[in-house]
């Protein structure tokens, strides 16, 4: 009744408003529900990249009182070795592309330098001797093997040349592209010394950018000897990362390109077979691996 009377007041100013009517209709003690608390501001959590493999671990080997050898330990993994059939500059020597599993091993952060070679062997056979931090060259595969044997005696560890699979695994550093930095050859000068920027000589190791695993000069500067003998293709190649060895085969694998050659030779999959194990040339050097390997 009070509601009706309030609405029928003759004086318009005294008539009840709609809000007054609503208030009168509510039960005694009723209150409108409280507004929900504002949603807390979203907290942005840092996004951690998911590594393809565990992080490589560096360590330093002492060769003499003044000369050391920097190594990088790589975890076991698997990768696609060689060039795909669709590769525009691939040749039959780099096929078929195949999956390879590799055990953990440590590899040199840089190619062996002239200072390191001389500290171990007592001589420097290199042509380009303007800087002791240049990679050693004019070393044969046999010379590289002798260095590894003597370094093993000095350190008490097993040092050797990388297998071809280990070398490509380390070079690619998780990539599947032409180069370990991508497919664009115009970027090669940031990562490698090759015919387009070398002025036809070697340069100190580590002057260019490394690959994703912190390895320098995997492309360019000097070709690097591998443990394996030469084969014309990857047909029947080992899938366990071991060296592919043949008795009485005197041609060995070289990888990585050099200061003398064009970008095609610096591709991660490129294989060079021009040299017998006893030949020396100013294009050829090596880097070492620490870890047990298979022997024939």
For every predicted segment, state its role.
Residues 192-219, 247-248, 273-277:
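Short, well-ordered junction/capping motifs at the entry into regular secondary structure
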Residues 61-126, 139-142, 219-220, 227:
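A short glycine-rich, aromatic-capped structural motif
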Residues 8-11, 121, 152, 171, ...:
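Protein kinase-like catalytic domain
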Residues 84-86, 112, 123-124, 174-176, ...:
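Acidic glycine-/aspartate-rich tracts in secreted/extracellular proteins
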Residues 1-33:
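C-terminal lobe helix-coil module of Hanks-type protein kinase domains
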